[in-house]
């Protein structure tokens, strides 16, 4: 369950979790492994993937390929967020807020992997409710995806950035 960090094609690949599954059949149990991975470019693109196989390396490889196919763009303010955001997925609820330079990533396991892969270096984050890694990762990515920059908000409201920021 440790994180694996590999630079491949300038992508940061993180292993979030590996679980063992078993299927009971007439002849006994069939074991398989499910992997959850996060892939990012460190510049605002992030993807999550799941893979399942009879062997751990094959499950991780499938999860990495799946994550690369499901990448989304995230709007960042240099190396932190624009404003605090709350998001949830299933019974997992995550709260993320920007932090000043030098703070680092103050977040739990699954969320930390997402922030490291997407390129956020200063953030404060907390998980409420379920800490299931799959739901926490999905909630974190959903929260990051719904963040808009002041430019986008100003354009949507028909105002200038100065009027919005006060």
From Swiss-Prot:
One of its GO terms (molecular function) is rRNA binding. One of its GO terms (cellular component) is small ribosomal subunit. It holds the Pfam family Ribosomal_S5. It comes from the Bacteria. Keywords: Ribonucleoprotein, Ribosomal protein, RNA-binding, rRNA-binding. The keyword Ribonucleoprotein applies. Residues 11-74 form the S5 DRBM domain. GO terms for biological process: translation. The N-terminal domain interacts with the head of the 30S subunit; the C-terminal domain interacts with the body and contacts protein S4. The interaction surface between S4 and S5 is involved in control of translational fidelity. With S4 and S12 plays an important role in translational accuracy. Belongs to the universal ribosomal protein uS5 family. Part of the 30S ribosomal subunit. Contacts proteins S4 and S8. This is Small ribosomal subunit protein uS5. The gene is rpsE.
